[in-house]
Amino acid sequence: MFRRLLNAIRYRARLLPTLPIRRRLGQQVRALDDAGFAFISNNCLAGQLYEMAGRPKSTPTAGLYFTGDSYARFLEDISDGHATSWDRIDPDQMTRHHQQHCAMLRTGEASGVVFLHYPEPEVAARKWNSRFPRLAGREKIVIASLRDGIAESMLDRAKTRYRHFYVAGPAPALPADEFVLDRKCLSGLSAFLDDVLAMGREAARR
């Protein structure tokens, strides 16, 4: 009980200095969500951005992380219109990640999608399958954190297929729960989203 309280106090102490930039990010995400954008990330970061904005998660990439080349393959497939490879996950094809005690979808010998917050494959598949259709008709903003076996060189092809691609690095990038408590990381992402919004305003004036 005491340790839990102490951890909560420490978390709040780290959270307070980032509140202004988190509010700014929430405003940016709401504006981009209203403009028809969707966030994709290789870890929980996209989901946390929607939480900052108080919006439903218009992305399947929440509560999970990709390993190895699985994220690059995912990005390339959906940009090519091959969403059928990913639009529906069968829980019977999933395994359990023994270290994390959660559901996992293997996509290769050393790659896969780890559903960190979902212990049961049925729940993980249901969450993914309900959220994936929300990407339809939306322009994607891609966030790639260089960690969990994801190297920037793996993303070279995917970068050419998306107008808005943000790389969080250098490797190893902070995990999502640390990233959202780091003012420098949040400021860099906010500056990137400012550029996306500015491009949208410029396009609207033409």
Describe the residue ranges of each PLM region:
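Membrane-proximal basic amphipathic "stem/tether" segments
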Residues: M1-D34
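Adenosine ribonucleotide-centric catalytic and binding domains
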Residues: I40-Q93
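A basic- and aromatic-enriched beta-loop-alpha substructure that forms the phosphate/nucleotide-
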Residues: Y71, D77-V123
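Extended, basic/helix-rich recognition subdomains
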Residues: R131-V180
